[in-house]
A protein has these predicted regions:
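Short, well-ordered alpha-helical microsegments
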Residues: 35, 57-58, 129
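Charged, gly/pro-rich active-site loop segments
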Residues: 2-5, 76-145
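Short, intrinsically disordered, mixed-charge
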Residues: 19, 62-67, 116-124
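A generic structural signal for short beta-strands and their flanking turns/coil linkers
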Residues: 22, 36, 45, 63-67, ...
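Short, structured patches in soluble enzyme cores that scaffold and shape functional sites
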Residues: 28-30, 71-73, 102
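A short mixed-secondary-structure module that forms the rim of ligand-binding clefts
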Residues: 41-78
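An N-terminal domain-cap segment
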Residues: 1-44, 48
Length: 145
């Protein structure tokens, strides 16, 4: 980061923000970089997401698991009218940037737990959600996490 005074290292607050931010963007190396927005959850110092076991993202990750991930939240918009119309408009963001390696979770029990955490993040009121009912039944087998 260019501005050292903007670096934020409070791990608890970073974790708190990751649990609130609605989506992130994962970038993968391809002939040209490929970046996709993903729903995610943060648990135990790791980023989790799920996806189909087909398509461009899956193929790229299968061939090269090196990824970067960012999630952001706008803090403040600074309009051009600020300081007597002497500014180019800008924004302040809270953002997290992570580089790492993608890994598929093969253990079905852990995969089910992660899928449950993903649903819980986006539907906290869904206290009756079960991985053994309806559309969720067997879904951990057909997806990568």
């Amino acid at each position: 980061m260019r501005r050292k005074d903007f670096i934020f290292e409070n791990i608890k607050e970073i974790e708190n923000m990751l649990n609130k931010i609605e989506f992130g963007v994962m970038a993968m190396p391809d002939k040209i970089p490929y970046a996709v927005p993903i729903s995610f959850c943060y648990k135990d110092n790791e980023i989790y997401f799920h996806g189909a076991m087909a398509g461009r993202k899956h193929e790229i990750l299968k061939n090269n698991p090196e990824v970067s991930f960012t999630a952001s939240k706008v803090y403040s918009y600074i309009p051009s009218s600020f300081l007597n119309n002497t500014m180019i408009p800008t924004q302040f963001f809270f953002s997290v940037f992570i580089e790492g390696k993608f890994e598929v979770i093969e253990d079905l029990s852990k995969k089910r737990k992660v899928l449950y955490e993903l649903v819980k993040k986006y539907e906290p009121e869904n206290i009756n959600m079960s991985m053994d009912k309806g559309q969720f039944k067997g879904s951990e087998i057909r997806t990568f996490v």
